[in-house]
């Protein structure tokens, strides 16, 4: 395991988050380990909406000290877990209810 400090800033806003990253034998990057607080906040956001807009992804990343890519991948993985847990009950209608529509972006 490599341990370090991830200091990311935006304008005058800075957040500092401790992280753990494991590396595989061939030097490739392995799993990201999220803190309990990060996981809790991500789960709360997922409970509110299974799909997150780019703007919201940016906001979450800033507040948790993670990259937007990490947020995007966490949500992709969490949706797959949700799909497995709900089995055949997961229909396209249910997924479309959670996915933002164009009207959400246009403001109609």
Curated annotation (Swiss-Prot):
A GO CC term assigned to this protein in UniProt: nucleus
Main subcellular localization, coarse class? Answer: nucleus
GO function terms (MF aspect): DNA-binding transcription factor activity, RNA polymerase II-specific; RNA polymerase II cis-regulatory region sequence-specific DNA binding
Gene Ontology terms describing biological process:
anterior/posterior pattern specification
Location(s), subcellular = Nucleus
The cross-references to SUPFAM superfamilies, in alphabetical order and at most eight, read: Homeodomain-like
Q: Which cysteines are joined by disulfide bonds?
A: none
Gene3D superfamilies from the xrefs? Homeodomain-like
Name of a matching Pfam family: Homeodomain
Name-wise, this protein is Homeobox protein HB3
Source species of the chain: Tripneustes gratilla
Record lineage: Eukaryota, Metazoa, Echinodermata, Eleutherozoa, Echinozoa
């Amino acid at each position: 395991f490599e341990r370090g400090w991830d200091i990311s800033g935006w304008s005058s806003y800075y957040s500092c988050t401790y992280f753990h990253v494991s590396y595989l034998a061939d030097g490739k990057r392995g799993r990201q380990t999220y803190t309990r607080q990060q996981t809790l906040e991500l789960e709360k956001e997922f409970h509110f909406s299974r799909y997150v807009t780019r703007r919201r992804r940016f906001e979450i990343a800033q507040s948790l000290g993670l990259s937007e890519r990490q947020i995007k991948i966490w949500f992709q993985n969490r949706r797959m877990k949700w799909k497995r847990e709900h089995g055949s009950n997961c229909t396209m209608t249910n997924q479309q209810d959670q996915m933002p529509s164009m009207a959400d972006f246009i403001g109609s």
